[in-house]
């Protein structure tokens, strides 16, 4: 059977995955405009910036502990030391990552846009991190990851003066690691805009979970999912970290239709 998107796997032909590639497909000015829509009013994305994926040309999802062109190398190396006791593990995969400017005018700083995308409610899972393997390295990394998330949780509590943070390796691991990484990157001096992106009207995913009809419904869904881990009043609020740069968490919704079948070249 002909795949609609031959660059993607057979199980990646619908939902949020192809939409992320479609969102980053087009001229550099077009893509920069779309990504700016995820960041504004807190910042912008220029056409000269680096982002991944890059349409269907670069379909890889970045792990930020590995050297990349989006954040400084020294930050990637520090993230690796923070998250792993032993090299060789995998860190969170980001659906979209882009350089961005955070702030306005002369006060703007080079930052990073981190996107976690969803097309239906069942993608917002509350699972714990998978158990560690039998090897000593796996066990040590499992513990280190728990320690890193605990460190981020304490840091966010201090930062906001809100004891309502409850990030954990052992519950709601996905949203916990997303906020932990956003916090750590900002603590390392890189402003962060963390976007939970809801793709509206993904009707082809209705067999998997409830789809999202409007931005308000998506926002309610994200905040309900995050409740108990992330205080509701931190969304859309720039948080000033100890490094002097901002961390901003957002829930944003867009309509991105699946285009007609892409034919192989």
Segments from the language model and where they lie:
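Non-catalytic C-terminal interaction segments of nucleic acid-processing enzymes
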Residues: 171-265
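Charged, often low-complexity linker/regulatory segments
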Residues: 1-50
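Active-site metal-binding core of divalent-cation-utilizing nuclease and nuclease-like domains
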Residues: 61-108
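Conserved catalytic cores of phosphodiester-cleaving nucleases, focusing on short active-site segments
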Residues: 96-98, 111-119, 178
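Acidic, metal/cofactor-coordinating or nucleic-acid-engaging core segments within structured domains
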Residues: 128-194
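Short loop/turn segments at strand-loop or loop-helix junctions that form parts
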Residues: 115-121, 196-201
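Short catalytic/ligand-binding loop motif for oxyanion handling, primarily in non-cytosolic enzymes
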Residues: 105-106, 121-126, 187, 202-206
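Extracellular structured ligand-interaction cores
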Residues: 91-95, 110-114, 170-172
């Amino acid at each position: 059977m002909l795949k609609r998107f031959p660059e993607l796997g057979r199980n990646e032909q619908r939902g949020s995955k192809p939409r992320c590639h479609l969102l980053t497909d087009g001229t550099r000015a077009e893509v920069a405009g779309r990504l700016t829509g995820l960041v504004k009013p807190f910042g912008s994305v220029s056409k000269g910036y680096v982002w991944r994926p890059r349409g269907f040309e670069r379909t890889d999802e970045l792990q930020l502990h590995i050297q990349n062109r989006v954040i400084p190398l020294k930050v990637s190396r520090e993230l690796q030391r923070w998250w792993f006791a032993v090299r060789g593990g995998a860190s969170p995969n980001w659906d979209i990552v882009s350089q961005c400017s955070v702030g306005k005018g002369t006060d703007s700083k080079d930052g990073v846009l981190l996107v976690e995308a969803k097309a239906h409610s069942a993608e917002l899972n509350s699972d714990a991190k998978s158990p560690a393997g039998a090897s000593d390295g796996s066990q040590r990394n499992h513990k280190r990851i728990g320690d890193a998330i605990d460190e981020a949780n304490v840091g966010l509590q201090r930062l906001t003066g809100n004891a309502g943070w409850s990030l954990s390796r052992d519950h709601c691991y996905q949203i916990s690691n997303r906020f932990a990484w956003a916090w750590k990157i900002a603590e390392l001096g890189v402003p962060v805009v963390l976007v939970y992106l809801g793709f509206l009207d993904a009707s082809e995913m209705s067999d998997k979970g409830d789809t999202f009809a409007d931005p308000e419904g998506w926002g309610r869904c994200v905040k309900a999912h995050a409740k108990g881990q992330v205080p509701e009043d931190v969304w859309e609020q720039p948080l000033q970290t100890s490094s002097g740069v901002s961390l901003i968490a957002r829930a944003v919704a867009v309509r991105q239709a699946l285009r007609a079948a892409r034919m192989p070249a």
